[in-house]
Amino acid sequence: TDPSGRRLANAVHLELRCDGRAYGGCQTACPLFWKEAWLKPVSDAMTGERSTLDADPADKPLGEASCTEDDVQKATWGKDPGSADGKRYFCQATELLTYTTHLPWWDVRQYVEDYTSGNSTLRRLLKAFVYANYHMVARKHKFGIGTPFRWLYDRFQALIGGVPYPQRRGAIPDDQLTPVAALNLQPGDLVRVKSYKEILATLNTKLKNRGMAFDADQVPYCGRVHRVKTRVDRFLNEKSGRIMSLKTPAVILEGVWCQACYSHLRMGCPRALHSWWREIWLERVEESTPVDGRRFDVRRVDKSPS
């Protein structure tokens, strides 16, 4: 899959996520894409005697080319004898490449759009650009400057209370099995994300624990306290369209999603996908512990990860 971004014009995310009921019980909770042509400002929608949400569908005659709700339901899946439930699902995530276009990271217009649309502040964009350039230099191992550059980065971030260098290697060799923990976390449980150092001790050199990657954009949440939003046992494979089960369950935390501050070639992506957390990366805390929370707002979507 192309690791760079994708462009989707005239679209936004709302405070709505897919509940997975139409897709085999998928628990990923992806944010939904909404074309602006499908939406209407509340101030305009409420000027009539009743809103369009209350309108009777029979009031609007359907033409031959109209798409009904039944048509949409039928289009969500097809037969797939090789899958666990005999279905191949089609959703916005599985079909992303068909309705978006390639967006190279060097296209400056996307960053201008991030700022002018309100998706990002100027300060956040500048921090992301500084990190991207610093990382590019720090990974030049052949010049022998990678290690001291990463050390300097960590020292500076420690002084200002920032995020440590988020792209270090895990401690476990790839040919060894990574550890697991069974906390049996349930929705509503209060947990603290372990330190980055503790999490690296559970990852192999490819930054994976039992096949699940720990992303650089999860590092800012290390040490923070959140409630468990849901467990993840089933998810829709975006490449195959098949429902799959996790051999080692994970959880989603409330108010925690990818901020795309450290994403390679996808800086500033507004998709805000929920991060998945192995239980070994978390620890229970007392109910009296203050919770860190963030709000998921309406965002413009002009780029998205492929």
Question: Could you say what each language-model-derived stretch is?
Answer:
Residues 1-57, 62, 72-77, 83-187, ...:
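Basic/aromatic-rich interaction segments and small domains that mediate binding to polyanionic partners
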